[in-house]
Design a protein with these regions (language model features):
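Active-site nucleotide-donor binding segment shared across nucleotidyl transfer reactions
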Residues: 55, 65-115
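Conserved small/polar residues in nucleotide/adenosyl-binding loops
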Residues: 209-214
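Generic recognition of stable, solvent-exposed alpha-helical segments in well-folded globular domains
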Residues: 59-66, 116, 120, 151, ...
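Glycine- and acidic
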Residues: 46-56, 102-107, 204-208
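C-terminal or mid-to-C-terminal helical accessory/interaction module adjacent to the motor/catalytic core
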Residues: 154-208
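Conserved catalytic core of two-metal-ion nucleotidyltransferases
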Residues: 69, 115-163
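N-terminal regions immediately upstream of nucleotidyltransferase
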Residues: 1-79, 97
Length: 217
């Protein structure tokens, strides 16, 4: 999962290293915004020397993995719930200003039992001014919704476990392979149909249609 190199993190990122230490040890809830501001300041400065754009994007993704994991462990660590990165974030390459696409995965009874804790986790992310796209679903709901909506299906093509229950995530991977992503030809035809429908909505002309780069990648 997270692979942050101590050669640059956190010693080179934070002017006051104690800010990160208090956060990572669960001793502070009031400096989330400060941490994110300092990290973004670092990434947009001339200080970091990454070998490639790919490394830059991976380091950003790695940092947010760690940030989310710290907050998750404060609220939902011992629960039978998984925090999964999906979509572009699931690829492990996070562009500046990109949403963090998150799937909170659990059995329905766990979602109902721990709804307040899940809400607390999400509230902390919003309070930190994180831009997130999230869903809270069971494995069965993921499969059902993805079969009915090719956009959701596409979003589940790339995914990673960030924190939480490994068994739930492994079961999720097995069900995706068995029920959703096993037939590549069917998926291709659905994507083609989606593209054609989107084209029609824009008057059947390229002069009125600007493709969504995120959809086309």
């Amino acid at each position: 999962m997270t692979n942050l190199d101590n050669n640059w993190f956190p010693n080179q990122v934070f002017e006051d290293i104690s800010v990160w230490q208090r956060f990572s040890q669960g001793r502070s809830h009031d400096n989330y915004k400060k941490i994110l501001l300092e990290v973004e300041k670092y990434f947009t400065s001339n200080e970091p020397t990454f070998d490639s754009i790919s490394e830059f994007l991976k380091k950003r993704s790695d940092f947010f993995d760690l940030f989310l994991k710290v907050i998750w462990n404060k609220t939902l660590k011992s629960k039978r719930i998984s925090l999964v990165a999906v979509g572009g974030y699931g690829r492990g390459a996070l562009h500046p200003q990109s949403d963090l696409d998150l799937l909170i995965l659990a059995e329905e009874i766990e979602i109902q039992s721990h709804g307040e804790l899940i809400e607390e986790f999400l509230t902390q992310l919003w309070d930190a001014n994180l831009i997130i796209g999230h869903s809270v679903r069971s494995i069965e709901q993921c499969i059902s919704f993805a079969k009915a909506d090719i956009t959701i299906n596409t979003n589940l093509l790339e995914h990673r476990l960030i924190a939480g229950n490994k068994k739930i995530y492994n079961d999720f991977c097995s069900e995706l392979a068995k029920n959703l992503h096993g037939d590549t030809s069917e998926f291709f035809h659905k994507k083609l149909e989606e593209q054609e429908n989107r084209y029609k909505r824009h008057g059947n002309t390229c002069l009125l249609y600007t493709s969504d780069a995120a959809d086309e990648v």
